[in-house]
Amino acid sequence: MLSIKTKLLGTILPLTIIIVLVLTGISYFISKSIISSYSENLLSSSIENQSNEIEAWLNENLSSFQVAKKTIEQTKPDDAALKQILNGYCGFNDNYPDGLYIADENGTLITADDSSKKDSDPTSSVWYKDGLTRVNMRFTDAYTNEDGDAVISASGILNDGSDTLKVISADLSLNRISIIVNSFIEMDDAQAFLVNPKDGSILAHRDSSMISTRLSDSGDAFLKDVGAKVADGDYSLTKIDGNMTAFSEISGTDWILVSYIPTSIIYKDVNKVRTDMILVGLISVLILAVLIERVIHFTIRPIKELTSIITSMTDGDFTVEVKTKSNDEIGRMGRGVEKFVSTMRGMIASIYS
């Protein structure tokens, strides 16, 4: 036969444990949701600022090229003066160390004296063909030059007043662009790379060996899945292969900036909090179990005493003493038993007298 204390503990303790576990679980998922939302906002803000910085960097270089182009078009220099202008830009900026160069429709390439730029067939080059399609200088798609370097070029038609069709151009190394891309990352532990959505090629990446490779040809599942989203034109923030991933279009270009951070890093702190919460929950359950046991013990002790008295009375012993101190239901019960014992004693005494 189970005692009241055992029954109460058997009912209350499991409910207490369930409540503590549920509260711990709810707290964990709320914390995880808050951290996830915060991280998404931080990654979105980071990639937006990063895109703006890259756009500003590209525009700054493009503006420099445009100034040089307009200077040549307005001054219409002779060959010697043109060389002097090109020499002034060669080595002037680390972003385009070879400065500017010009090719005409006859295949003549004009470069600065100290420039290392080489092109055996300028009129067949990417930069020349793209330059023929526009007056204002714009960036080409990425390509590999004769030196085997991955570059992009800013090119456009040069109107220097001569009867010969000319294109002016300048090269930016993709390795240099990679440095710029990764230097603007604001979120700790996040990484970024630049993609050309036309062919899925990587324009900038922390790992230089990845530059000019295609996302679809990568052995990395994450890069392949990113390539699939880029190909679909889906640039919404999402989780891809365990990475929170954000996309941003670079204004003035066709490029897509991809920034990502492993979710394991994001949830590292919340997982620690979960472990701490479980530990606190277990300690709380133990403390509550002890407190509940003590409360039940002191609450039902008068009932146990009354049970003992009633048992003695059923055995014919009316000499028992009932001590009642409380004013609750148990106290009223005790006083009733006390009155009954007193009445029975009187009846027994009258019988014997």
List the predicted regions and their residue ranges.
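Cytoplasm-proximal transmembrane signaling helix
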Residues: 12, 16, 256-258, 263-314, ...
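Extracytoplasmic/periplasmic ligand-binding sensor regions of membrane-associated signaling proteins
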Residues: 91-96, 105, 110-184, 188, ...
